[in-house]
Amino acid sequence: MKMKKLLACLLAVSAMVSAVGCNFPFGKTSSSSDSITSEEQGGGSGLAGIPEATVPQEDFQAHYVEGMLHEVNVDYNSPANLNFIKDGQSEYKIVLGASVANESLAYVNKHFGLGAGSMLEKVEALTDDEQENLAVSENSAYVMFGCTYAFEEAGFVMPDYEKIGGTGYYVVTYGKNVFVQAYGAQGYQLGGIALLRYTLGFDMISTTTCVYEKDGSVLPKMEITERPDFDFRQLDNQLIGHDVSYGMGFTTSEMFLNTGTAWMHNVVDFLGGDASLGANDGTNVAHPKWFSNDTNQTQACFTAHGDKEEYALMVENYIQKTIEFMKKRPSTDNIVIGQMDVISNDRVSRCTCASCNAAFAYYGDTNAGAQLAFTNDVSRGVDAWLETAEAKEYFKDVAGIERKEMNILVLVYGSSINPPVTRAEGGALLFDENGKGIPKQQKWFNVDEGGNVAEEDVLDAEGNPVELVCAPSTQLFYCASSANYLHSFYEAENATYSNMVKGWSGLGGNFYVWTYEVNYFNYMYPYNSYDSMLENMRYFKNTGANHLFYQGLYENANNAGFDKLRSYICSKGLFDTSVSYEEVVAKFFKYQFDEAGDIMREYFNQVVQQLRANESYTGGSVHSNDLTKAVVWPEGLIRTWYNMVNEAFAMVEYKKTADPERYEQLWTALTAESLFPRWVLCTTYANSTSFSNESLKDMRRAFAEDFNKLGNTTHKEHFTISDVFTTWDM
């Protein structure tokens, strides 16, 4: 029996949204393609009327990753039990054998109750004796999390840590019982999700939709060994709540140590405060050479203006600050030393002192050489401290950590995006026989009192020249914000950036990746990164990355442009890069919009086709206003999409009384997708003769009301929409 349930309890925004229809202020307009002329279609697409719905990227174009661990053996024909949870009843008990599995067990048991109608009785058996007393046999009925003693007594052997790491898991049935085993909390999280998937057909689609495709009566025979393709799967939208992100399989623990200002653009936290506002401890007065040479000292100077004494003091300051941060968050193993972001020209991108300029030129028009050399010195100092008795005792006593490690990341971003590697005479990157960048000899650039620069070789303890490569605990965080994310890094449009990746790959270090999925100048508009996302995951996994962060929105809870689809693609692809794009998209529309799924999929396909046909107008930058050009979005087409969302609402209107809880969720999902065409009508076509001034006021009032109900605040990165609303005559 197939069963689908959709949970209001997972909808964080539900409390903010009243169960009322979308505020469409004017009547339905014609959706006939005959009513839209070729000229109205615009954008040089060559299409007359509404573009045909297209199937997105076909799977045969995919660059699949080999060697990933997804050994899934699930047998429903010879199940472990046909009466696992039936008619809200179960003989089973759920057993906690290790405290590290507690959150996963609680999450699974909650969904047994929500999806199958019965939570299982919980038993704690944290010791060998307690597990022995359970008398586990093939005829007992237990769901066991972390019960290592019982697991081994049943004759099972855990896969090696080298194989599944702390994020992988092993799920296996033993008679009527099932074991969920892992080496860490993330492994138990994903193992628990797997158990829900194969017993309940569980899938967390979005903040508004959780689905159960099975009724929980069958416990299939299982043996599953899996490890996610990316061990670190960072959430793309930070406003997705913990419960939903946990169920989507994102890493929910703190991956990067927050130093105060942030976890990424945080260099000022190592210097005593926000330098652009004046360091609150006067550090920038006592040590001006630690800062960039602009008037407001907005960045760090990674060469200390060529002054070796100041450089040594600066390195030691960063070491001590890093140790201080580590002690505050002892369980976090990654810290970024990241230059401040440049927002609206409020900061310089780098220091331009004589020493930094010399390093910039020597390493190939990049600040990365100086930044990597500095980070290496900090990293070695932190590693040396971690070997001391003081450090070992501290982390063992405070966090139970036997051997603490700390990865210190270089933020490969902005003026540091180019790799500091060997280049040909014309500036082109040179690669070795393995297609990797060739390291350069490390240099120091002294600056005397007269401002003269003298180049000096950096030598090791034996007096040998040193190549600039990553120190043992120095890692790379690659953030190509200027790439074209309409395309994958396999495509010609991103050849420059894929060459940079190859260049960086010659410098060692683990590769962390930060990519982008929306246009940050225009949150209201769809950005066609949907079908390139999986390919970019495959590209970076094939280059050796183990962490990927697809930065989406972090300022709006329910944005336009099918933003929830991107989060769903992330959740699936970061776990298994071989998933089918078409299957992921089809499942999303099937469940996210219920009966309106088909028309919303048609709307999506038409938007994608329109964007593809007009890429010459929009370009692919995530920091551009070209996406808003009127030629790309003719009024007739925008009205057609507006009407399609209106029709979608009509299809689910009956649920307002039949299932009010679900209607609230659908209201949120559909209203979010209505924002794009309504925004274009309220802005680009505000002077249209198609409606009166009073209609425009009504339309804008309704838009503002719904935008706020959805829990949104922002129309452009760092700019609240209230600035726009104050200019509207409402």
Residue ranges, per PLM feature:
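Bacterial signal peptide processing site
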Residues: N23-P25
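Acidic, contiguous N-terminal accessory segments
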Residues: G27, I36-Y170, S217-E223
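Structured mid-domain segments that build the active-site/substrate or prosthetic-cofactor binding neighborhood
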Residues: C301, E309-E316, Q320, E324-K327, ...
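C-terminal motif of bacterial Sec signal peptides marking the signal peptidase cleavage site
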Residues: S18-G21
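Feature activates predominantly on carbohydrate-active enzymes
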Residues: E91, V95, S99-Y107, H111, ...
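Catalytic domains of carbohydrate-active enzymes that cleave complex glycans
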Residues: G544, C570-M730
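Gly/Pro-rich turn-and-neighbor structural signature
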Residues: L313, I319-L507, T515
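Sec-dependent signal peptide recognition
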Residues: K4-A12
